[in-house]
Design a protein with these regions (language model features):
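Active-site metal-binding motif and surrounding structural segment of the metallo-beta-lactamase
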Residues: 48-49, 61-120
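Short coil/turn segments at secondary-structure boundaries
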Residues: 41, 64-65, 100-101, 133-136
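Flexible, acidic/histidine-containing loops and adjacent segments that form or flank the divalent-metal
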Residues: 1-24, 102-188
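Conserved beta-strand hairpin/beta-sheet module of binuclear metal-dependent hydrolase folds
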Residues: 19-81, 146
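Short, flexible loop/turn elements at secondary-structure junctions
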Residues: 28, 32-35, 43, 57-59, ...
Length: 188
């Protein structure tokens, strides 16, 4: 296992395992609590096939936008700008926030370093037109809206007891998985 670190950027753990006639490289970008894996598979006479699984960091991570922009640049360098398959495992903020946090970097990269995504896989729950997925998404979005309103309402109360504060913090933790809550707007 090779590991390279940088005080200004993400930590990258590499593990290359030999599989048959070729080597597969799996890179885990450790940018705090969050997920981002890059798998590269050599191909004869062409650039390696690249698979990116998730691209995020936990809500409230210090300098998250800088970290994710640096990670995007590193991924562009390692893939020669092409991700053959992007897999988004699920919609939690720590799995998808990089696309929001590094959006301007992804859009404004020089042509030679720009990231292109050829194919996208998402969870079945994200498929428009799937009757069950559509119902689940609708109900889930209603619940997120209700939780956000409850949090916003409770956060404005004065003289709240310790038990209520702990409950409010727990609710904020749930909201943080979806990129919502106080941590998004700079609160605790």
């Amino acid at each position: 296992v090779k590991q390279s670190t940088s005080k200004k950027g993400p930590i990258e753990n590499n593990r290359g395992d030999s599989v048959g006639q070729f080597d597969v490289t799996v890179r885990m970008f450790c940018q705090g609590l969050g997920d981002c894996f890059l798998i590269t598979i050599p191909q004869a006479d062409v650039r390696p096939y690249s698979i990116l699984i998730d691209f995020g960091v936990a809500l409230g991570t210090p300098s998250a936008d800088i970290i994710m922009k640096q990670t995007a640049v590193k991924i562009a360098e390692l893939t020669q700008g092409t991700i053959d398959l992007l897999i988004l495992s699920h919609e939690h903020w720590d799995h998808v926030s990089g696309y929001v946090l590094a959006a301007d970097k992804l859009k404004n990269m020089k042509k030679t370093k720009k990231l292109t995504f050829k194919h996208l896989w998402v969870a079945w729950t994200e498929k428009d037109g799937d009757p069950l997925a559509d119902v689940l998404r609708k109900e889930f979005n209603k619940a997120k809206t209700a939780l956000t309103r409850a949090f916003d309402s409770a956060a404005g109360l004065k003289g709240v007891d310790d038990t209520s504060v702990r409950r409010l913090q727990a609710l904020n933790g749930v909201l943080a998985f979806y990129g919502l809550g106080a941590a998004k707007s700079g609160g605790s």
